[in-house]
Amino acid sequence: MSKKVKAAVLTAPGQIDIQYFPYPKLEPGGGMIIRSLQSGICGTDKHSFKGESKQNTGTDSAFEAAYPFIQGHEAVGIIEEIAPGCFSHDYNGEPLKVGDRITFCPDVVCGDCYWCRHSSWYPWCDSKERECYGNSLSIHTPPSLFGAFAEYMYLLPKTYVYKVPDALSTDMATLTELMCVTYTLDKAKELFAFDGEGFAFGGTVVIQGCGPLGLAHVIKARMMGAGTIIVTDISDYKLNLAKAFGADIVLNSLKTTAEERISLVKQASHGLGANVVCECAGVPAVVPEGIEMLAKCGVFLECGHFCDVGGIELNMHKICAKNVRILGMNNHACTGYRPTMEMMLRHEKDFPWDKFISHKFSLDDYEEAIRTSMGPESMKVVVVANEK
């Protein structure tokens, strides 16, 4: 009898079903099978669970979540099998073998379109061949196991795979993809000029929303030499965690007005305003407030809207009046995985990393896991598929 693989399937918005699938058979050139260790629940997983399934709207690579499908892409796994002719090395040229612990980029790109050839460091691919693990591949596409919320997962031949350093714990490695998304702070720093533009050492950073993405930006801003870090959220639990990870000022949006928050940001920045505001809440209504918080020549980083949840009215004069730069964030750099893992190792003792993952659940309890992840007293929620 062939081995069966247990997986948590999102059959429709709000509906989870534990199902079993045949263990995949690899043909020559046919990719890789990993034994899933664990995967974090991402904001896009929550959006798909709620039925907010549109991504990359307005581009040639626009798609909707392919219900029914297996979610999970912030993953760490062990190489179980490698098809002949595939994956001799990882993205950085490190040799790969069965038994290696790896993570991977969720986006599988064609490698041949304009964007793949001109921006190979970033998954901009506009080809219809582009896929996204835990999102765009239905269980009706063989071999079904395209998400990490399963005991085993199948990786396509063009997947960018990254070997995890032996010294990095699986819990910390699970945060790699999330921490890669903070690279827009690096982009903001590139804009620095002595006339006051951009973000430099000692600059004031505001982070709107302190879920896992917001907390990752707190960590990155502190690593990059931010001066005052100010965080807004509606959960005291999350704001207290932000303080533990290096935030200087935390503001509960349910206990303060927008006018009070804007005033407090000005007071904390010598009356100038923030050099950078990172929108990580995924709530369109907070954007105008973030623009108001900026100093002249400030940079607004839009990091919280990977899914299309609608728009807002925005007075464009506010952008012009202060020479505001707006940087969108659709994804993360494929080149960022190894540097991110090395960066986390270097700063292993500088942050209470063990507090980042607040909950762990089994595959059988996936529905409870994703509902917990949307609550006010959780940070990164992880689903454990195999203990080792």
Model-derived features: positions:
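Phosphate-binding beta-alpha-beta segment of Rossmann-like dinucleotide-binding domains, i.e.
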Residues: 106-150, 189-198
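Short SAM/SAH-binding signature in class I
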Residues: 272-278, 298
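Glycine-rich phosphate-binding loop and adjacent beta-alpha segment
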Residues: 243, 248, 284-348, 385-388
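N-terminal Rossmann-like NAD(P) cofactor-binding module of classical short-chain dehydrogenase/reductase
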Residues: 103, 278, 301
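Short amphipathic alpha-helix with an adjacent loop that forms part of the alpha/beta core around
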Residues: 258-270
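Glycine-rich beta-strand-centered segment in the early N-terminal region that forms part
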Residues: 24-39, 54-117, 146, 165-167
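Mid-domain Rossmann-like dinucleotide-binding core that forms the NAD(H)/NADP(H) cofactor-binding site
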Residues: 151, 165-255
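C-terminal hydrophobic helical "lid"/dimerization subdomain
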Residues: 2-3, 288-292, 334-388
